[in-house]
Structure formats: C-alpha cells, structure tokens
Amino acid sequence: MARSLPRRPSTPTLDRLTTDERGQLLGELLVAHPEVAAEAERLAVSRLATVDADEVAEDIEWTLREADADQLSYRAGRVRGRGYVHVDEAAGEILQELLQPELDDLVRRADLGLHDAARQMALGLLRGLANCQHDVEAGTVLAYAGPDVTDDLAWCVRDELAEAHLDLPEDLPEDLLEDVSAGSDLEPEA
C-alpha cells in the first residue's frame, strides 16, 4: 500500500486571511512561541536567498510592456504645480515607478547580506530591460518613453548595486555588460 503524505488540517479561517492579517498573525505567533523564531528566520532567509533571474526578467518585462498608457493623459501636458510635462518625461516616470519596487527588493536582499540573490535580481532586471528594447508596440508607455528609457532604467539598477558595494553578476551577457557598465567603475565579479 502506498504511503500518503500527512493531511494538512483544515484551516478555513486562516485560508481567508488577507496578506496583512497573515503578517500580523505571524508576528503574534512568534511573540507567543519564541521557540519557533529561529525556524521562521531560517525559512525567511531561504526564501529571500532564492532568486530566479529568468523569472525576474519575465516579470519586469511584462510589467513595463503592460504599463497603463491611460495614465499619460493625467501626467503629461499642463500639470498643476509642475507646469508643462512632456509625454516622454511622464512615460519615463511611470516606468521608473514600476521598476522601483524591484530595486527596493534588490536593496533589501543586499542589506540582509544575501549578495548572490541581489546580484541575480539585478541580472534579471537587466535582462528584462534589455528585452524591452525590442518589439515595442506603438501607443505603449515604453514607446512614448523613447528608445533610451531602458538604458536609463538599467543605470538605476547599476547604481543600486554600486550603493550596495556589489559587483555586476558574473553571468551578465556581454551585450548587457557593454550597455550597463560603459563608463562605470563596476566590473563583473571574478
């Protein structure tokens, strides 16, 4: 007879908690049961240390390609308190705002000492940005931002690595290396 895995107990209320409620509950459990804190920390490190650069690349490429072009009507043209904002400037700002959470995640991992994960995150972001240089559809935020926007965003990734005192990933493709490190003191790690 085949041995089955133990069944997870039914937890209908837990299953319906929001992300915030789950976070609060985890905090309460760790206070009530400090003996599980070390295991929770180990699991957290394990989760944050694992980054799939290809998945990051796909995610950021999709996010930037699917940016909501309708926002341009609110952010370009005459804007109260800013004067006239060109459509390419507004589009670049939208893309920068979409990239920022990923940059924050890269910095978070670097600050935790998870340098390989931060490098893989950077590699994925750079690959995704490079992919966005091709086959840009007219009428998208990427198209309105102009052909240099992905290079500008790649410099943001490079700058975050530099601030974290990290080198570019070893497996950075040469075409990305030329674009991102031109004129930079950063070199791929040996």
Language model segments and positions:
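Eukaryote-biased, non-catalytic alpha-solenoid scaffold regions
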Residues: 1-12, 20-24, 31-190
